[in-house]
Amino acid sequence: MRIVFMGTGDIAIPAFRSLIRHSDLAGLVTQPDRPVGRHQVLTAPAIKNIAREAGIPVLQPHSLRSPDALSNLRRLNPDLIVVMAYGQILSQEVIDMAPMGCINAHASLLPRHRGAACIQSAIKSGDAETGITIMHIVRKLDAGDIIAQISTPLEGSETGGTLHDKLARMTPDVLLPVIHSIEKGTATRIRQQEILATYAPKLLRADGKIDWTRPAEEIGRMIRAYDPWPGTFTNYWNRKKRIRNMKIFPGFSILPEAEGKPGQVLSAGEQGLLIACGSGGLLVTDVQLEGSTRMNISQLIAGHPNLKDIHFDV
């Protein structure tokens, strides 16, 4: 069974490597090389380099809707198309191209957290578990029939980054058996319950602004979920009465008994910066001021002795 893999994000790499080892991989479709960094160096997706090393043909169309892109994809003659973190919405023509189907590996337990920010959303929502879903692709976002799922508990210490890596490692454990069942004609199809669907749209940097009127527990989940992307930040007024920005990183503690006006600095010491929330307080230990580098609270206090007078915007 000839398989074409479509993927760009690093979360897709373990699945792609497993297909190189255990299947007849006809090709990789990934996003075009992009300018990266301050100097805008044209950089290939990491998965492209892996494919090249393995001698796998690579397609990088700007749009899979163009006649040339569709023609090149047909020439790979796929029996099955497998998608994970590709980055383009597929047309019905692509979905129907492979006779054995077009399936997707999605990093949540569907129908919960449909969309691009599924990993962050599971942490931010305080879910007890999350996982990987293998499903048939349909035109509606992440709404296709489920073939299989694998789950993992959320322990309350994960960040968006650590959970991303864990789910990436888990994917081959559910994907390979699904592919074998499709080849044998024994794959199951379970319709998603629309009434249970939730959505996790793509995040922007502005989504990381902290609302200090929210409970400390909720803000803490947001900080963990949005690390490393899009990050969390808060604004404050400096001595020159200009609004400044401060990023906040995981490494905090939650103090349920703390009381104060949301955004108020209750204390500033070696243990951290205690900020009042809508309920409870957040003891922050690692921050980054606008135009500076990441630092601990001791370093922050050394350069800003009047932290107690700061009030963060809600």
From Swiss-Prot:
<dbReference type="InterPro" id="IPR037022">
    <property type="entry name" value="Formyl_trans_C_sf"/>
</dbReference>
<dbReference type="GO" id="GO:0004479">
    <property type="term" value="F:methionyl-tRNA formyltransferase activity"/>
</dbReference>
<keyword id="KW-0648">Protein biosynthesis</keyword>
<comment type="similarity">
    <text>Belongs to the Fmt family.</text>
</comment>
<dbReference type="InterPro" id="IPR011034">
    <property type="entry name" value="Formyl_transferase-like_C_sf"/>
</dbReference>
<dbReference type="InterPro" id="IPR005794">
    <property type="entry name" value="Fmt"/>
</dbReference>
<dbReference type="GO" id="GO:0005829">
    <property type="term" value="C:cytosol"/>
</dbReference>
<dbReference type="Pfam" id="PF02911">
    <property type="entry name" value="Formyl_trans_C"/>
</dbReference>
<protein>
    <recommendedName>
        <fullName>Methionyl-tRNA formyltransferase</fullName>
        <ecNumber>2.1.2.9</ecNumber>
    </recommendedName>
</protein>
<dbReference type="InterPro" id="IPR044135">
    <property type="entry name" value="Met-tRNA-FMT_C"/>
</dbReference>
<dbReference type="InterPro" id="IPR002376">
    <property type="entry name" value="Formyl_transf_N"/>
</dbReference>
<comment type="function">
    <text>Attaches a formyl group to the free amino group of methionyl-tRNA(fMet). The formyl group appears to play a dual role in the initiator identity of N-formylmethionyl-tRNA by promoting its recognition by IF2 and preventing the misappropriation of this tRNA by the elongation apparatus.</text>
</comment>
<feature type="binding site">
    <location>
        <begin position="108"/>
        <end position="111"/>
    </location>
    <ligand>
        <name>(6S)-5,6,7,8-tetrahydrofolate</name>
    </ligand>
</feature>
<dbReference type="Pfam" id="PF00551">
    <property type="entry name" value="Formyl_trans_N"/>
</dbReference>
<dbReference type="InterPro" id="IPR041711">
    <property type="entry name" value="Met-tRNA-FMT_N"/>
</dbReference>
<keyword id="KW-0808">Transferase</keyword>
<dbReference type="InterPro" id="IPR005793">
    <property type="entry name" value="Formyl_trans_C"/>
</dbReference>
<dbReference type="InterPro" id="IPR036477">
    <property type="entry name" value="Formyl_transf_N_sf"/>
</dbReference>
